[in-house]
Amino acid sequence: MMKIIAFVGMPASGKSEASRIAAEMDIPVIIMGDVIRKEVLKRGLEPNDSNTGMVATDLRKCEGMDAVARRCVSQIRETGSELVVVDGVRGIAEVECFRQEFGKGFILISIYAPLEVRFSRVQKRGRSDDMNSIDGLRQRDERELSWGMGEAIEASNVEIENSFTLETFRKDVNDVLNNYLKSNSEK
């Protein structure tokens, strides 16, 4: 049975870092935000937070709240891997889409970090779609919560706290991923 481990969490909580750890373990990673970023460029827009948010909202409005997840399903299957990591679930409709597609093979891991910790990370990472104030981060939180992010976080199988050092977080993610890798090889 194919296993999908998906990371959910508020912006800058550590989803991308968790996915990097998976990639270092040779687990294929599908980044849901890449679907949005690709659509932003396809529409000829500047890849900033405002346009990224507008396109993400528009896709969900026109194609359904699970639009991004549905676009990722074929990418997941194309990996041909028994275990795939999905970075960036944003709402309960996406969780339901993946659960319908992959059944018990779908595992949702929420990553938690407080607002102030997340904002300090945003300031350091310098992505084009990042916000430049704590109020901007709050607005992005509200936008993502309006997509059902809170319900998706509540639906997670496991929570990893990311309020401490990077080393602690990496160890926690490694432990969780190794647990699922081990259970995948024991079938």
Swiss-Prot record:
Record: residues binding ATP: 9-16
Keyword Methyltransferase assigned: no
InterPro entries tied to this protein: NTP_hydrolase-rel, P-loop_NTPase
Disulfide cysteine pairs (residue numbers): none
One GO MF term: ATP binding
Signal peptide (UniProt feature, chain positions): none
Keyword annotations from UniProtKB, A to Z: ATP-binding, Nucleotide-binding
Family: Belongs to the UPF0200 family.
PANTHER family found in the cross-reference section: DEPHOSPHO-COA KINASE, UPF0200 PROTEIN MJ1399
Name the UniProt record assigns to this protein: UPF0200 protein MA_4660
Species whose genome carries this gene: Methanosarcina acetivorans (strain ATCC 35395 / DSM 2834 / JCM 12185 / C2A)
Lineage: Archaea, Methanobacteriati, Methanobacteriota, Stenosarchaea group, Methanomicrobia
